């Protein structure tokens, strides 16, 4: 899918989602945040953002496809616009955000929306920002926002903002099943339930191994505490393995569970009629 699409005065962008392949909570920081290590992997599940220039100041936003609890003016898309407006003289815009990426899913939907808004404003108004500058602004909005400025498979450190490209062999011909039960995970509680520790082997090294080894070595540190409070998530992970997944995990702090399969697992689509489910080719 193209990153930008122009029709007349409107520009459309397609923010993509991500999954976490491995996630280790390494240490608690003095500022209250946590250092972690993970691999961000982009997946082709997209939101859609339409942007047109407006004669009115600010960012007027309509959100479709999801009932988000926050004030629309607190949405990360609007906050991204406000950050760019602080540094560049840009006009007001009218935005329609169509949510396809599930919310509170550990798939980075809101972060991706913010990053793609920054990229869209740069394109729309010919600002000429470098990727590093856009990543700087994106990082002010969320720990994983910077990843979406150039969403390629990346090893992330720090709070998720220190990025380096990573090569993962063998995923290109695989299928990804995404299952999100109708439950939400408190990120604060997920962190509270985990004692930070340095892993014996870095997830960057594990993902360089054959995928068949991941199940025994690659872990998401949030799973233990989250699965205790929301057992359905652990049950879905176990079920994906029973249906033939090579590797299954929770993404981020949840609540999406994903499985990687050799063949398209069509039975997964029918196994969870009440949950968000999707199967895509990696």
Language-model segments: residues:
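ATP-binding N-lobe of GHMP and related small-molecule kinases
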Residues: 2-105, 123-132, 168-171, 180-183
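Residue-level signal for inorganic ion chemistry
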Residues: 21, 49-51, 77, 110, ...
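Gly/Ser/Thr-rich beta-alpha loop segments that engage phosphate groups in nucleotides
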Residues: 24, 34, 77, 108-112, ...
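Solvent-exposed alpha-helices and their adjacent loops that cap or buttress functional pockets
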Residues: 42, 139-140, 146-149, 166-172, ...
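Conserved, helical-rich catalytic subdomain that frames metal- and/or nucleotide-binding sites
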Residues: 59, 150, 154-247, 260-275, ...
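Glycine/serine-rich anion-binding loops at beta->alpha junctions
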Residues: 96-125, 143, 246-258
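Contiguous, small/hydrophobic- and glycine-enriched helical/loop subdomains that border
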Residues: 114, 118-155
């Amino acid at each position: 899918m193209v990153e930008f699409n122009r029709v007349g005065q409107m520009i459309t962008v397609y923010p993509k989602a991500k999954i976490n392949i491995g996630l280790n909570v390494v240490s608690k920081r003095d500022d209250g945040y946590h250092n972690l290590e993970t691999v961000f992997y982009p997946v082709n599940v997209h939101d859609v953002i339409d942007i047109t220039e407006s004669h009115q100041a600010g960012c007027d936003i309509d959100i479709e496809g999801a009932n988000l609890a926050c004030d629309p003016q607190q949405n990360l898309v609007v906050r991204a616009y406000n950050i760019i407006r602080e540094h560049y003289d840009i006009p007001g815009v009218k935005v329609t955000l169509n949510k396809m990426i599930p919310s509170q899913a550990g798939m980075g939907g809101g972060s991706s929306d913010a990053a793609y808004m920054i990229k869209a404003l740069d394109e729309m108004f010919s600002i000429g920002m470098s990727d590093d500058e856009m990543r700087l602004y994106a990082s002010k909005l969320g720990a994983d926002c910077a990843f979406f400025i150039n969403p390629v498979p990346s090893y992330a450190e720090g709070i998720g903002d220190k990025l380096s490209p990573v090569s993962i062999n063998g995923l290109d011909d695989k299928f990804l099943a995404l299952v999100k039960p109708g439950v939400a995970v408190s990120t604060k509680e997920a962190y509270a339930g985990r004692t930070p520790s340095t892993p014996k082997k870095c997830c960057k090294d594990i993902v360089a191994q054959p995928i068949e080894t991941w199940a025994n070595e690659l872990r998401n540190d949030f799973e233990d505490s989250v699965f205790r409070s929301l057992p359905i998530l652990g049950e879905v992970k176990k079920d994906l393995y029973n249906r033939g997944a090579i590797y299954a995990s929770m993404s981020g702090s949840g609540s999406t569970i994903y499985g990687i399969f050799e063949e398209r697992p069509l039975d997964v689509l029918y196994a969870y009629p009440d949950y968000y489910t999707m199967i895509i080719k990696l």
